[in-house]
């Protein structure tokens, strides 16, 4: 599977501006505060740093999580890694495509590769830990530099 490397401009520079990012965990949330919901996924940089994802198992519908709790488990070539939630809430939908097509996570990390949809329970507190807008790309560059992979 080909995807962006951790040092590639695509992994670092393409961060949709409408999302909120928990940089240290390399996850994002597309928040609809009016509706009280968020769609959650893994960043392109997070995927580039992790490598190929062979299996993705999000938490079940109805699971209640705090910001930073494990929202999914992904199986990589040589390890299994917990994916942390950028927001607190209850899982209300799991991406149905991921069961049969886990590659969607790295093919379209900000589109069809989303993990879960959540009903927000503490957005006012959670948002203080998330980056948004112009602060995101510099933080992604810094995270990529700190976690650069040896060729």
Residue map of PLM features:
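Small beta-strand-rich domains/subdomains or short beta-sheet motifs embedded
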Residues: 57, 75, 81-85
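Short, well-structured beta-strand-loop connectors
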Residues: 59-74, 90-92
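Acidic, low-complexity mobile loops and tails
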Residues: 2-67, 112-122, 131-134, 141-151
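Short, conserved beta-turn/loop elements at beta-strand boundaries and strand-helix junctions
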Residues: 31-34, 94-100, 125
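Mid-chain, well-packed structural core segment of small domains
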Residues: 81-112
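Short beta-strands and strand-coil junctions in structured, solvent-facing domains, enriched
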Residues: 80, 125-126
């Amino acid at each position: 599977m080909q995807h962006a490397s951790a040092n590639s401009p695509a992994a670092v520079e393409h961060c949709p501006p409408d999302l909120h990012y928990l940089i240290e965990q390399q996850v994002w949330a597309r928040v609809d505060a009016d509706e009280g919901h968020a769609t959650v996924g893994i960043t392109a940089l997070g995927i580039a740093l992790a490598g190929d994802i062979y299996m993705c198992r999000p938490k079940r519908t109805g699971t209640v999580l705090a910001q930073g709790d494990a929202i999914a488990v992904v199986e990589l070539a040589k390890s299994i890694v917990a994916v942390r939630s950028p927001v607190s809430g209850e899982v209300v939908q799991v991406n149905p495509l991921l069961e049969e097509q886990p590659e969607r996570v790295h093919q379209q990390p900000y589109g069809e590769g989303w993990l879960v949809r959540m009903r927000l329970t503490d957005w006012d507190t959670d948002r203080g830990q998330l980056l948004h807008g112009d602060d995101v790309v510099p933080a992604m560059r810094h995270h990529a530099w700190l976690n650069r992979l040896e060729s």
